[in-house]
Amino acid sequence: NSGKPYWWGDTATVMDMRGQDFRFQLDTKKMERLGESSGGYGLGMDPYGRFYETHNLEHVSHLVFPDRYINDRTMLKKHTLSNISDHEENGTSRIYPIGQQDSRVNHPEQSGYFSGSCGILHYGGGAFGKEYDQTIWVADVVLNLIHVDKITSDGASFKASRMHEKKEFMASTDRSFRPVNMSVGPDGFIYVIDMHRKVIEHPEWIPDEIEDSLDLDAGKTEGRIYRINKNGSASGFEVDQFKTNEGLVNALSHPNQWVRMTAHQLLMGSSLSDEVAGLLKQTLASNNSFSRLHAMWILSLQGKLTTDQLLSCLSDKEQGIRENALKVAEQYLNDDKILSKVMAMLSDKDQRVRMQAALGLSTLPGTLASEKEKLMLQFLIQATDQSMDDWNVMSLVLAVKEKRTSFFDKLINDKKNPDPRILSSIVLSINDQQELNTILQSLAGSSLPASSVKQVLKTLSGMKLSSYEGLAIMASLEGIEKNADPAMLSSIAVIRNQLGLPPSLKFITASKKAIAQVLNKELSDSLRLEQMFLVKMLPFKEKEALLFQCLRNTEPLQIQEEAIRQLSEERDPKIGYRIVDMWKELGPQTRRYASDLLLYIEIHHDALLTGLEKGVINIGEMNFDLERRRTLLWWTDNTKTKQRAAKLFSDAGVVNRQQAIEKMKPALTLTGNADQGALVFANVCANCHVYGSKGNSVGPALTEINRKSKEAIMHEILDPNSAVDTRYISHRLETRSGGIHIGIVALENDRQVTIKKMGGTEITVLRSDIKQLSSLGTSLMMEGLEGSLTQQQMADLLHYLQKGAN
């Protein structure tokens, strides 16, 4: 159904669920979108109904609030599903498998990091002690382990912190152990499903030449289920408790979430008798927060919760109950007492409760919202005095509903320095020319700080605006331009362009001057960057020469990066050839951006391949992981491009020194000696690498290299230029006084460059003293180490490195 399910035989109920998680009721045939889906396997829910998700590299995300509140409006954040891990490294979290690792068939750089996270579980079993309450459990099916994070509040959302430092709750040396799902049982213990497969990777992501050597079905009949329990812990639940009404209500206070949810489900299975309703109303006064929570929901869904009872829940001492009571209150907002209480809760002491209060007010029917507009705006303005994160900002703007321009105007008039995030969020939600004109008029006549005006204009310039005919907006823009700095002028020029209005004379004059000012080294770097923003709107021919001059590594980094950004927006094939010609002179950071320009803009593929074929660009500098290789090998319609790329590398990877690797392969089967390996490391590697407490920090630290397979480590030793982190490319720096230094760029900023040489010696040179800085295109690590190592010495070194640093 292409992600658009409907009830059998009733196509009128079709609902677009693409990219969404959802829930449904069989008896009422009701479907409801929950919110954005991570796309991964598993969905965890805590005792208060908050959802946690997982997907491959991103092991734990929190659905901060459901999409139903947004209704397709453009918001400050594009996603309400937020990565909450506080232990990320370059976009994913480090994990600690045990035993000798297999070679990765793709993305070897992901070894030792989450890449197959799944089966997420919020543990609510209550059987493992307080230490494991409020924990998230996530399996990594690739690295054969189960990881545990502790969940704590973080503003209106949460953060996930590692429970065990440099180790996992469960890890296996059996490479066929594939945990894919977990669930809490009636006993409060965790049940783990082990899919058990020797090969877990999807065939699409296994290079064909490697796939031919693998048995993709190995282990498929050996799946199993494990139970994780705590010694001395026993279940305190008797299933007979479910046989009586009193037992069901009492079960709502059980420490095991499974028991509570099952009792809740059974109580909701039929209409409530007076006896059960009476028991639940008594439970609202219980000392147990879980029983109060479930009683409130059951009574409300059965239509038996009174206004006074709900008001009591809205004042509950437990934050999670107040949060849930606000969701219940959405059906009671036509009651003045409830509405007044919800408005007052915009200033609740808890940040997440404040967010939910605003979200609840966003559901207020239009007529009632208009009737209460003045009072609403008063409470919303007061709420801006509270500490806020982006989620609070978004919820406040949603609560404003159609009165956003009134809220914008009142904010800038009543508050000396209103939060620019709120102003920008309001701007994002405007949907017609009249609202745009009102916003611009308010800006033109305001005394807002320049930084706030700048942010609002930047937000507007990034929106899609329809063309406009009339003088009102023109007059407002001219009013703002009177005191505009270069960054503001640039944003206004973009806005004018989108509206179909001509650029102002002030902008035209300033942008012409900017061509000279960008290269004026007497100006501060920040002022020069502002001049770059003015240049952005000029035709490419007028700024072409300037942009390439800005790529020189003697220019400030921000200038280089802005130049490459502007070049990336143009579609002139000669740009690629010019960049390749300049390749050796590009700084390390700029070269990373330039490599993406050459690879991901197809008109530059010929320039890229020519540079690789001629050796101007070292193949290792392009970080050709599987997806980047396939951009040239598979995902282009240009047959010639595919053929040229296939001569440089295969789908399986980049190998420059196959003969040397084949000659040393027997070392992989020899028994290594760690003590002898330590001697080899000291003699061959320690001059540039740190391992444990030994060595010099020039190249990458090898402290965690044991997360890689022996085969992968040997490949990196013998073929150091097949894939080089651009931070470790060798450079030649020549000073104006004639000094020459060769090493890696250890530090590069707008003022100076630090070169680190073999052995760890560092030299720092001011940019003004640099005559030339050029890339040598290769790793500082030399090729040919196989000439100084026997196969046994290689085996010893590999064993030493895989053993783990002390």
State each model region's role.
Residues I190, G677, L702, G743, ...:
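Conserved RecA-like P-loop NTPase ATPase core
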Residues M182, I193, I225, G677-G692, ...:
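The canonical Cys-X-X-Cys-His
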Residues D215-T221, I228-V680, Y691, V698, ...:
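Long, ordered, helix-rich scaffold segments
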Residues H605, M714-A723, R727-Y728, R732-L733, ...:
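Short glycine-rich, low-complexity segments
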Residues N1-V249, Q257, H264-K281, N287-M343, ...:
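Beta-propeller blade termini and top-face loops
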Residues D212-S213, E585-Q589, G695-D719, H731-L776:
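Gly/Gly-Pro-rich "capping" loops immediately C-terminal to redox-active cysteine motifs
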Residues A295, L632-V655, K663, G739-H741, ...:
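C-terminal capping alpha-helices of c-type cytochrome domains
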